[in-house]
Amino acid sequence: MDARATIHDYYDSLRHGAPLDTFFADDRPEDDAVVKCGVSERLVGADSVKQGLRDQTASTSDWAVDSRDLRVTQRDTVAWFSDDVGLAWDEGGQRHEFDTRWSGTLEHRAGDWSFVGLHVSVATDL
């Protein structure tokens, strides 16, 4: 599987309420470098990111993920991407909908592509 397919699988897993923590790399012993910034949080370190994603999966449902402009560059062991994503979900009886911008970095480790950085922000005009 290449980096683009991994990103598409992540989007599909989000849509279907499947676990997302497995898409993120484990920290290497020498660093605490895995980072995920979402619409309302910043998680640092693989353990924090993975727990945050498990909590998100447990507390949300009915995700809509509309990828509008996915761009991926892949090299031997690193890839980076950006996308414009229509994002919506249910949480606590309330529907949340945003136009978002995504960017991230994946690393090829042990035969798989894993996120080492993911940033999701709300797209607004100033």
Regions found by a protein language model. Name each.
Residues 53, 67-72, 85-87, 100-108, ...:
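Hydrophobic/aromatic beta-strand elements that line small-molecule binding cavities or substrate pockets
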Residues 80, 97-126:
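Short beta-strand edge/turn micro-motifs at domain boundaries
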Residues 88-96:
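Short, cysteine-centered beta-strand-loop-beta hairpins and adjacent loop/turn segments enriched
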Residues 65-67, 82, 115:
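Hydrophobic residues on conserved beta-strands that form the core of alpha/beta folds
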Residues 1-19:
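Short, aromatic-enriched amphipathic alpha-helices that serve as compact interaction elements
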Residues 21-70:
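A solvent-exposed, acidic/Ser-Thr-rich amphipathic alpha-helical stretch
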